[in-house]
Amino acid sequence: MYLLYLDESGNPDDPSDRHFVLGGAAVFERQTHFLQQALDQVQARHFPRSQPVEFHASPIRSGRGFWRSVPEATRTAVLQDLVAAVTSVPEPGIALFAAAIEKSPSRWGEPAVQVATEELCRRFDILLQRRFHERSDPQRGLLVLAEGRFHQRARVWVEGFRRLGTQWGLLRNLADIPYFASTRDSRLLQVADLVAHATFLLYERRDAGLMRGLLPRFDRKDGVLHGLVHVTDADRRTCECPSCFSRRQPGQSGPWL
């Protein structure tokens, strides 16, 4: 079984944010323990005498809360160590996913979250289908989402996708309704937070500092980034983001990186 851990970045209701991102990591069940250990080792390396430290990328970058007294050089090293921990998981034990939703008059607030959820459910299902067809490896999937304002609605959406299908068709490989947890209680949801924040920085600010290390682990097939989706009203034939660019030139990530 693969467990897809998801968290969000950006405020879907805030007009100052042009994008809303839902992102995370699909982790093979036997790798979850080792990935959690890798994050625990990041804490042991930098804060060996502390109580469990919650890794949230945005406060780490900006120096908020616990991170206010931590030197910037240490905070930067922590983020890079977190990226290294995620990318250390051997393939096919992990695949990253993110949906960057460019907000519009009809696609903001709850609709933006619903579009992102539908996109990632579909792409996760495609990954599981591909593993079966290409490797004769029948795996089921389970979603674990960070608790938030829309998490109860997300349960309804995903159940609807399972029973009635998405706009692209039925989801055939999800084992159950989604489950929800606090990021404080789950290192794997902290990984999802890192992926979502890295994607938000790339699309909102053209800051590729975190995404550059994570992008190689996004789900892809024949050079096309299927794990990263850009939902926009602009012409995707000229968009130079990694998602759109790889569809025109497979194997290439484009100038943003």
Question: What does each of the following model-derived ranges do?
Answer:
Residues 1-257:
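Phosphate-ester processing/binding pockets and catalytic centers
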